[in-house]
A protein has these predicted regions:
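Thiamine diphosphate
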Residues: 1-166, 170, 174-177
């Protein structure tokens, strides 16, 4: 049975935590929704719930990155580009820090919560920031690849995640470039 993209993301983070001792996950009080709770269950000592304080979460991740950690920050996509933008721009992107962003419920996939939770402009905003890589995924195989790629690449990287179950477009063993 197919799984929601955000669940694949959470599972992959937990798997990466098994081999990357410097991987830490921060979440803005939505770990059940972003599925970063799967990482928390596997690695509770490397999970930080920052509460509804996205700018603080981004600034904390910047500090962690300067000490050798690979932080993944997680919240709804709309809050990555609104509530945390100053820290992203001024600290993470200008500093080319190794911080990863998991933007859940991107686009209109959070229709139930209304227009305030739609992230339609997230890629437009983030592509204007220096050093930012953007990975907009399309299915489960690409989500696994993108999460692993983000963990290994250097510098800031945004993974745009849907809330929904998406049909498989690629075989699980597809080689992305």
């Amino acid at each position: 049975m197919a799984k929601a993209i955000r669940e694949i993301y959470g599972e992959t983070l937990a798997e990466l935590g098994n081999t990357m001792e410097n991987l830490v996950v921060l979440d803005a009080d939505v770990a059940g929704s972003t599925k970063s709770a799967l990482f928390k269950a596997a690695h509770p000592d490397r999970f930080f719930d920052m509460g509804i304080a996205e700018a603080n979460m981004a600034a904390t991740a910047a500090g962690l990155a300067t000490t050798g950690y690979v932080p993944f920050i997680n919240t709804f996509a709309v809050f990555i580009t609104s509530a945390s933008l100053l820290a992203l721009r001024g600290q993470i992107c200008y500093g080319n820090l190794n911080v990863k962003l998991g933007g859940a419920y991107a686009g209109m996939s959070d229709a139930r919560d209304g227009a305030t939770h739609h992230a339609l402009e997230d890629m437009a905003i983030l592509r204007a920031l220096p050093n930012m890589k953007i990975l907009s995924i399309s299915d489960a195989a690409e989500t696994r690849w993108a999460t692993r790629y983000a963990a290994q690449c250097s510098g800031p990287c945004y993974i745009r995640l849907s809330r929904d179950v998406l049909p498989d477009l690629y075989p699980q063993d597809h080689k992305f470039t």
